[in-house]
């Protein structure tokens, strides 16, 4: 560690000790002597050396008066959806986003076998689903909404002309495990148990086969595309994370075996700025990787008490990682400290979870969502305080194996072992 880093770390420790001292002083000042003494004992602060003081209250009051002056400007997406999840600034945030329990099924599409993969485009206008039958469907969101709403003829006169499924793609030999839309081009990328990653140009109506194939040595389980669209982070049934250069098809891995996971990988996600990406594994760990050097920079060990970690997802601002595990618990981790800030509990209380399932935020990051396997219902929590929200019956006749929320609208899709994918939407909201 550099000398500057050591000095900064010492300053942080001093500031934290001062913060605890101010809290204890404030508790004494407000008449909460017992609480003050208990906190002093926990943080090993000599209670007798702390005098009652209202200083903390005054500092907070001054800080709140000037807080808006230091907030960063919002980008275009944040102006539309709100700033997203940021526990540093928010105390009582207001949201216009609908509770997940208010969503309704707008369309159902069927495959010939279990459905276990889905993805939205960045603008939320298209969604793709993938199945164990090795087929992929691309569906138009406006057309799905028009099919389920008699009044939609006026709102979407062009949408009702055609069928919601605008493309069906066949070029894999085994289960489709993951799907990603390219952020800039009309390209859909698919991963499969046949060890291949394929790229489809869906701008051509006649194209059913891939124009490019990357062949791995192991079954592909998950992938995440770099925001630039130039690179692909890929996980397989093995413990080693791959980074593919899409144009050259070159594959890169971390050269240090001790930094790798020790079990099969289950999930990977880039942060929005692509400086880092996160992986989940059956070894029970979550790892954070440098997006340039491919080195592991952080490990969250046994995040779900040793249970398999099923999914990872970054918040929009990159400060937090949302993880889900086979223990049916969803957790919010602070990247800067490596601490679990919030545990979202209550799913899996009826029966033990057997299959991997993904947790997700809604489009505004006001809610955390996770499927309860035993009841085939959707559990939802307030993202900031883990308060339980109403359940939503998902209407599937088998486990929900994958879910993905639209990045910009109140819509999500559920994929189930009952061969179906359900498109959910909440109408008449901002």
Regions picked out by a protein language model, each given a short descriptive name:
Residues 401-430:
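Blade-level signature of beta-propeller repeat domains, shared across WD40, Kelch, NHL, RCC1
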Residues 1-107:
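Eukaryotic adaptor/scaffold assembly regions
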Residues 94-103, 138-166, 173, 185, ...:
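Per-blade loop-tip surfaces of WD-repeat and WD-like beta-propellers in eukaryotic adaptors/scaffolds
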Residues 15-23, 28-35, 39-43, 52-56, ...:
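Alpha-helical interaction elements in eukaryotic regulators
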């Amino acid at each position: 560690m550099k000398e500057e880093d050591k000095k900064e770390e010492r300053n942080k420790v001093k500031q934290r000790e001062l913060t605890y001292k101010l809290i204890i002083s404030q508790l004494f000042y407000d008449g909460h002597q017992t609480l003050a003494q208990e906190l002093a004992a926990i943080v090993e602060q000599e209670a007798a050396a702390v005098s009652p003081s209202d200083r903390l209250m005054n500092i907070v009051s001054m800080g709140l008066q000037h807080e808006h002056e230091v907030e960063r400007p919002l980008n275009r997406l944040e102006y539309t959806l709100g700033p997203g999840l940021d526990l540093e600034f928010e105390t009582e945030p207001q949201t216009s986003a609908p509770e997940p329990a208010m969503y309704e099924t707008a369309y159902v599409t069927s495959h010939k076998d279990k459905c276990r993969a889905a993805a939205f485009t960045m603008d939320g206008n298209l969604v793709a689903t993938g199945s164990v039958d090795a087929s992929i469907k691309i569906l138009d969101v406006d057309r799905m909404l028009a099919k389920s709403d008699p009044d939609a003829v006026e709102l979407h006169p062009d949408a009702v002309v055609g069928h919601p499924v605008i493309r069906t793609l066949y070029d894999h030999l085994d289960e489709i495990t993951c799907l990603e839309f390219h952020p800039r081009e009309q390209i859909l990328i698919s991963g499969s148990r046949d060890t291949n990653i394929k790229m489809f140009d869906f701008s051509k109506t006649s194209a059913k086969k891939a124009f490019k194939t990357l062949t791995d040595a192991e079954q592909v389980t998950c992938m995440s595309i770099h925001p630039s669209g130039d690179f692909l982070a890929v996980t397989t049934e093995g413990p080693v994370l791959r980074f593919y250069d899409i144009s050259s098809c070159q594959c890169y891995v971390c050269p240090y075996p001790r930094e790798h996971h020790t079990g099969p990988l289950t999930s990977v996600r880039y942060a929005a700025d692509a400086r880092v990406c996160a992986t989940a594994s059956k070894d029970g760990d979550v790892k954070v990787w440098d997006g340039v050097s491919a080195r592991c920079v952080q490990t969250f060990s046994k995040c779900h008490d040793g249970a398999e970690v099923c999914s990872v997802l970054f918040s929009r601002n990159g400060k937090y990682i949302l993880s889900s595990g086979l223990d049916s618990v969803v957790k919010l981790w602070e990247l800067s400290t490596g601490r679990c800030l919030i545990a979202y509990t209550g799913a899996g209380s009826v029966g033990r979870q057997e299959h991997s399932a993904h947790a997700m935020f809604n489009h505004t990051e006001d809610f955390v969502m996770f499927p309860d396997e035993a009841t085939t219902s959707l559990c939802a929590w307030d993202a900031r305080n883990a308060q339980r929200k109403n359940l939503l019956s998902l209407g599937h006749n088998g486990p929900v194996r994958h879910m993905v929320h639209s990045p910009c609208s109140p819509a999500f899709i559920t994929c189930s072992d009952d061969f179906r994918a359900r498109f959910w939407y909440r109408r008449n909201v901002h």
